[in-house]
Amino acid sequence: MNQDLDRLQPYPFEKLTALKAGVTPPPGLHPVALSIGEPQHPTPAFISAAVSGRLDGLATYPTTRGTPELRAATADWTTVRFGLGDGGLDSERQVLPVNGTREALFAFAQAVVDRTSDPLVMMPNPFYQIYEGAALLAGATPYFLPLTAEQGFLPDFDAVPGDAWRRCQLVYLCSPANPTGTVLGVDALQKLIDLADEHDFVVASDECYSE
């Protein structure tokens, strides 16, 4: 067995379920779930229609890269949404559809981290649990960037010592952040990019709340 499995922490939503067990909301009040980011609105009709119209394809495996149409639509949307300008994203080289962000965020660490060089993987705290789990199973040590009220619930890159940056191989970033809702500014993003260029680490920018 992989000994790194012993380093994993209990999944927080299992702990939350245990904490909520036996809790009954007051009569007449509808509880609002603030845990897993699950859509609370009905699926738009045009999506349901598109899916039901392709049910015959459920018997076959899709391509790993996704269809050219999907990749092109993703690249076009991203280019417009984030103002990437001429060229934008190359749908052939820079777009890879995945089954939810968890899969991609985990794979980043497995692909990037060299466990033989005492690596650090940095992440905000509080954080999405997969950041820590991916780092641990890649053989890295998680390095937590505390999101404190004094710092406006944003990571303080200036507080990280130079030795930590030199050991860093991957930084997980979530902006807009969950659960704080804060957005990292352009100057802070540019600083992180400059640090990545200087110390040769990868930034995994988790932007699942951008909309």
Task: Name each region found by the language model.
Residues 59-194, 210-211:
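Conserved core of the PLP fold type I
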Residues 4-100:
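N-terminal small-domain helix-loop-helix segment of the aminotransferase-like
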Residues 41-44, 180-182, 199:
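Short catalytic/ligand-binding loop motif for oxyanion handling, primarily in non-cytosolic enzymes
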Residues 172, 203-204:
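Walker B beta-strand of ABC/ABC-like P-loop ATPase nucleotide-binding domains
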Residues 207:
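Walker B catalytic acidic pair
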Residues 23, 138, 198-199:
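Helix C-cap/helix->beta junction micro-motif
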